[in-house]
């Protein structure tokens, strides 16, 4: 518990000032988080740190974060060449790297970096947008955990995450309505309360799907945590699994409503 608390305090001391500063500071922060998450995923997938794959994946992420500074044609060409280079590693390693592994890495590269880029874009909207997203996820996770402990009887996904219950999931999502009401009354994110509640419930549910997706990935590769980069908390992918999926979802919903 002591290690967990110390890690959380240090992480907040580093993360919060960069979040408040926003701009290029937070852009670099979210990109760095994406690279660290990909480091964890590469290690899970290949059982070692494949520097070539990690580097190529990180370059794809950089192109996404710098897309406004690079011409579209050049960007598409570079991404295409990088994907070809990833596929070429199958031949260069004598088929030690499998096609399915490269396919997974290509998909997850997009999944991770789009998620973190959307988190950066939310900060560009306002600090309130990021605070809203993080608090929605935190409320959902916390109340789903305690609600499941108290009332959980039916497994949500027994083969992927046997400790999660349907009751806990529902309680977690319903608890997020508190965040909807709070941010409707204190910010200009939402035009009316009903929209705030609808968006928040959807974000809450999508965040839980993000958690299950990460759990499925870890179960596939038989690991408990994505890494030990955050002692007591696991890895970056462990901490941001819900955010990665819910950030793009929130941007889409805000454009719809």
What would you call each of these model-derived segments?
Residues 18, 232, 247-249:
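Hydrophobic residues in alpha-helical membrane-spanning segments
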Residues 82, 116, 244, 248-250:
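Hydrophobic cores of alpha-helical transmembrane segments in multi-pass inner/ER membrane proteins
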Residues 1-165, 169-201:
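Membrane-embedded alpha-helical bundles of polytopic integral membrane proteins
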Residues 35-45, 137-153, 166, 205-245:
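Acidic (Asp/Glu-rich) catalytic motifs at the cytosolic membrane interface
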